[in-house]
Amino acid sequence: MKKIYIILLILFVILISLIGASILLVMSLSGENVDLFGGEKIAKVYLCNEIYFDYNQGDGIFPQQKKDARYYINLLDDLEKDDSVKGVLLVVNSPGGEVIASEKLARKVEELAKKKPVVVYVEGLDASGAYMVSAPADYIVAEKHSIVGSIGVRMDLMHYYGLMKKLGINVTTIKAGKYKDIGSPFRPMTKEEKEYLQKMINETYMDFVKWVAEHRHLSINYTLKIADGKIYSGEDAKKVGLVDEVGTEEDALKKLEQLANVSNPEIVEYGLEENKGLFGLTYYLGYGIGKGIGEVLYGMEKINGRVELLS
């Protein structure tokens, strides 16, 4: 009987060890560093993709959680609550993304910055919605030849009624509600419809301008002058007040350690790997702000009728 108890105890220990190893393996495959001990830490978070909400997390044979805005919001929330994390270095290389996703992530950064220091390091591209996310940080460091700004709003609506006419294709739309088919690709847009959409774009743009002005301590009038959709090099962004310093990642880390009052902290990285599933191929539809240079730099294809916080 005693031998049976010993065998059961050994099996129990082996089972617990296997469960622990499995948890560590899953966390490792998800692209996160695993910290088993306490101590002062700096979290390095890589924001290196488009900012959007992905409601299809299961594509691919071995699906993993995608690095959408919800992932970053939840991650920053965890880092905010973790007392061992003394500051956050946000490494940005993003063209922006959807309006709501960018706004919610930006508000999360704003909330985090009230609790512990946040420094942004612009590695290559910090445009439009991504800059909205960066603005509430305590300090922004950009590489000299990085691209910053592209603060503006843009909506693209594709029309192919001309092609349909040539092909002899007709579409009959039955609707209830005057604006129900606004932006339809099957007919020309009316002047009234265009004015309506322009008003919506203008309102979104002013919200963006006010956000930048507030968090970069600039006047509204001045921000309007520099927020005309123009892109700036890191050096020029420093001159107009969109970043605080032209420098390297080491400079950004040094500044964060200074703000957090820590020395030689452990650096824990998050969000570095891109997880799109084995056969993931996603076109993102929705509501966002401005397109432009980010599409060229990122090689991203977009589809009709989306307003974006993209460069």
Curated annotation (Swiss-Prot):
Its EC number is 3.4.21.-. SUPFAM superfamilies: ClpP/crotonase. Pfam families: Peptidase_S49. The keyword DNA damage does not apply. The keyword Hydrolase applies. GO terms for biological process: proteolysis. The active site is at S128, K180. It is an enzyme of class 3 (hydrolase). Keywords: Hydrolase, Protease, Serine protease. NCBIfam families: SppA_dom. Belongs to the peptidase S49 family. This is Putative protease MJ0651. It comes from Methanocaldococcus jannaschii (strain ATCC 43067 / DSM 2661 / JAL-1 / JCM 10045 / NBRC 100440) (Methanococcus jannaschii).
